[in-house]
Curated annotation (Swiss-Prot):
InterPro entries associated with the record: HTH-like_dom (IPR025948)
Pfam families registered for this protein in UniProt: HTH_21
Keyword Signal: no
Location of the region described as Disordered in the Swiss-Prot/TrEMBL record: 14-33, 68-93
Domain of life: Bacteria
Assigned keywords, A-Z: Transposable element
Keyword Transferase in record: no
Signal peptide residues on this chain, from the entry's feature table: none
Bilayer-spanning residue ranges: none
Protein's recorded name: Insertion element ISR1 uncharacterized 11 kDa protein A1
Length: 93
């Protein structure tokens, strides 16, 4: 059996050291990070898994899977222009 340091083993295989520690995504919770436990529960039910919503919620919380929030869109600082001008109608008379 040959023992080598992690850096040397990665150099021999011509791989970056960071690829060794990276894990592939596993399961629907990792693949669909914008889904919360409710939507994930529906997906599991559609696939035929008889699973309770509370169990999915507990596992989701224990694995610290949170919904990735979308970044807020930066505005240019100007108010949007009105596409339809307001004018009084004759119905108000």
């Amino acid at each position: 059996m040959f023992w080598a340091s992690i850096g040397r083993a990665c150099a021999i295989r011509r791989r970056a050291r960071t690829t060794r520690s990276a894990r592939p995504a596993e399961g629907p919770g990792q693949e669909r990070r914008r889904f919360g436990y409710r939507r994930l529960h529906v997906l599991l039910r559609r696939e035929g898994h008889a699973v309770n919503r509370k169990r999915v919620q507990r596992i989701y919380r224990d694995e610290q899977l949170t919904v990735r929030r979308r970044a807020p869109q930066a505005s240019d600082g100007h108010a949007a222009t009105v596409t339809c001008r307001w004018r009084p109608t004759s119905a108000g008379r």
